[in-house]
Amino acid sequence: MRTLAALLLALALGACTPVFFQPSSTLYATPGLYGIDYQPVEFKAKDGTGLFAWYLPARGHAIGSVLYLHGNAENISTHFANVAWMPAAGYNVLALDYRGYGGSDGRPTLAGIQMDIDAAMQALISRPDVDPNRVVVFGQSLGGALAIYYVAHSQYRSHIRAVIADSAFADYRLVAQEKLADVPLTWPLQWLPKFTVDNDYSPRAAVAALAPIPLLLIHGERDSIVPPHHSQILYDLAHEPKALWTIPDAGHIGALRQAAVRKRLAEYLAQEEQNGVRSNFPTAAR
């Protein structure tokens, strides 16, 4: 998450959930600039909002597919490097720009973005080169929070092998309160998020409903944006199967910059693919 000063000021003035969204329509880079094969993809959300994504096909035989949900700032052109290694590891990747981000239309809201993720999931599993029963949802920062809530309530739960949340916060109000408390000037205003921040899509309230879908939480021990205790909160509330990796010397969404962590994650993904489709999935959490 960026522009902390803007977040604090907006909260102090009584603004609400939109401060979590810092989109940009600027195209900063493309996978092609780095020799990575990709395809622009366009589709629509249920409410008709036009959405944009990049599809990065696996090199050779695909082990599975990943729906990637980026953080709160800019767009996929500044985040795709976090998953650029996955095609070489055998995974197709669909990287979504939420409404209002990058090439997608509309204005970001939590409710709208949940529709966007649902449309992206449908687009991914409908592709002829994708096994619809081998999908992992991977989100970072805001994307991790979105992923947890989405999968807990998704109509496509039976297609999802695992949820991975890197540097996710546990609760919208909690992280806003903590940011206000970090600064002496806004410390007295910690009560504001209780009344100004929409918490209907809180990952903390949804995480227990993920099971039996496996949950992997990743958090850098040096994350000063979303402190590691947020992943610990989510881990404590989640049911098995679950795992929490705390990564030394990693900051916010910085764990996957380490080759050892990427290798470990590739091994985790391969293991979840081998586990097969689990039986008795509910169609959605209620």
Residue ranges of predicted features:
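Conserved alpha/beta-hydrolase "acid-adjacent" motif
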Residues: S224-H230
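An N-terminal hydrophobic leader/cap segment in hydrolases
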Residues: A12-K44, L51-W54, P282
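Hydrolase active-site cap/lid region
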Residues: Y149-A206, G254-A259
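Catalytic active-site module of serine/aspartate enzymes centered on a nucleophile-bearing elbow/loop
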Residues: Q258-R286
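Conserved alpha/beta-hydrolase
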Residues: V83-D105
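Alpha/beta-hydrolase fold nucleophile elbow
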Residues: D129-S141
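Alpha/beta-hydrolase active-site loop
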Residues: P108-P128
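Short beta-strand/loop motif that positions the catalytic acidic residue
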Residues: L210-A211, L216-H219, D223
